[in-house]
């Protein structure tokens, strides 16, 4: 963790996870589940789940990008539901095409990361959704919308860094948004990490396997 002249920066996602875990300790005695947004949220969630002693799963939702800029989220989809922020220049045909593409990918992810494991029962539990950062918040809005259908006791969104606008948006939907950094000027999630390389599927499996081993040994 270093300070430069303009930005507080996390060394990597693991350090960010340690700092976030310290802010989430108050939930340690709750019946809870950590849900990691793949792939970048998994190393962060690894440290949080270790600290809290919660089981961890990947959140099987995926953003739907704007047709002219795929990185700009206009909504999100799960295998059974979806959420879209209306845009005048986004057609229903485009949305349906994206839903088909996204759900095909989600099915592959479910098999790869979770195999034949039954999803955790979220009813009445404190559900902590972890990502490596939030820019617009639109993807997580969709995730929260889907999770509500499982009747959790509480939904907490935990991230190392988030834009002010995203925190305001998500605070209306989640029960709490916990962020290590909410900078006055937001330059994109990656700007607040020294190491922000993409997380591979192999790394996701590594962290999920390590957490399973820790829980089995406990």
Label the model's feature ranges.
Residues 1-218:
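PRPP-associated nucleotide enzymes
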């Amino acid at each position: 963790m270093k300070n430069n002249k303009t930005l507080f920066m996390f060394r990597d996602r693991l350090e960010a996870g340690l700092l976030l875990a310290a802010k989430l300790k108050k939930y340690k005695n709750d019946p809870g589940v950590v849900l990691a947004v793949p792939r970048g949220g998994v190393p962060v969630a690894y440290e949080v789940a270790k600290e809290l002693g919660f089981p961890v799963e990947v959140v099987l939702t995926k953003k739907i990008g704007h047709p002219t800029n795929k990185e700009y989220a206009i909504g999100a989809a799960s295998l059974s539901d979806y959420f879209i922020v209306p845009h005048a220049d986004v057609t229903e045909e485009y949305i349906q095409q994206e839903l088909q593409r996204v759900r095909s990918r989600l099915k592959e992810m479910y098999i790869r990361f979770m195999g034949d494991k039954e999803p955790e029962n979220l009813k009445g539990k404190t559900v902590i959704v972890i990502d490596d950062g939030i820019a617009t918040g639109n993807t997580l809005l969709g995730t929260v919308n889907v999770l509500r259908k499982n009747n959790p006791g509480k939904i907490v969104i935990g991230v190392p860094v988030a834009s002010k606008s995203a925190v305001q948006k998500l605070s209306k939907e989640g029960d709490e948004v916990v962020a290590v950094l909410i900078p006055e000027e937001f330059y994109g999630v990656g700007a607040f990490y020294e190491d922000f390389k993409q997380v591979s599927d192999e790394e996701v499996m590594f962290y999920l396997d390590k957490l399973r081993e820790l829980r089995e040994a406990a």
